[in-house]
Amino acid sequence: MSRDAVDTSVVVAALLGWHEDHARARAALEGGLAAGGLLVPAPVLVEAYSVMTRLPAPHRISPGDAVALLGDTFRDVTLIALEPREIWALLAWLDERKLAGGRAYDGHILACAKKGRAGRLLTLNAKDFLSFDEGDVEIVRPCE
């Protein structure tokens, strides 16, 4: 069975009802959760927490609410994190490709998806992952 991984853009949109992509992100997330095969790269949870607690008013939520929302949604899913040696390999891979700045976070998320053997990475920002494409994880924007 091929499993889906999600990135931060899908998690934030799925959890915040006011988001313009809420319906499609929520449907994709619920589909993965219902199938029992959803993979969540660990850095996605930290980044989602960061985004949700720094949004401009009135959309910002408190740290406690962010933790509760993430916990209620993802406590029982498979979290994928890199080991120290895998982090060093990721940094070398980024350096070889001259990828810098925020691209490192996208690379970290994709590396976690690969480690979990995800067939697809669901994202609302597909273009952010295109330069990483090595054909082993399909980059997919959730359907309308």
Where are the language model's segments positioned?
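Short active-site oxyanion
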Residues: 34-38, 76-78, 115-120
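Acidic catalytic patch
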Residues: 17, 42-46, 74-97
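Alpha-helix/helix-capping structural signal
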Residues: 9-10, 43, 108, 127
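Short beta-strand scaffold positions
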Residues: 6, 39-40, 81, 104, ...
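Short, well-structured N-terminal submotif of metal-dependent ribonuclease cores
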Residues: 1-40, 55-68, 143
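Residues that scaffold the ATP/ADP-binding catalytic core of kinase and kinase-like folds
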Residues: 13-15, 51, 132
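Acidic, PIN/NYN-like endoribonuclease modules and their adjacent C-terminal/linker elements
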Residues: 2-3, 107-144
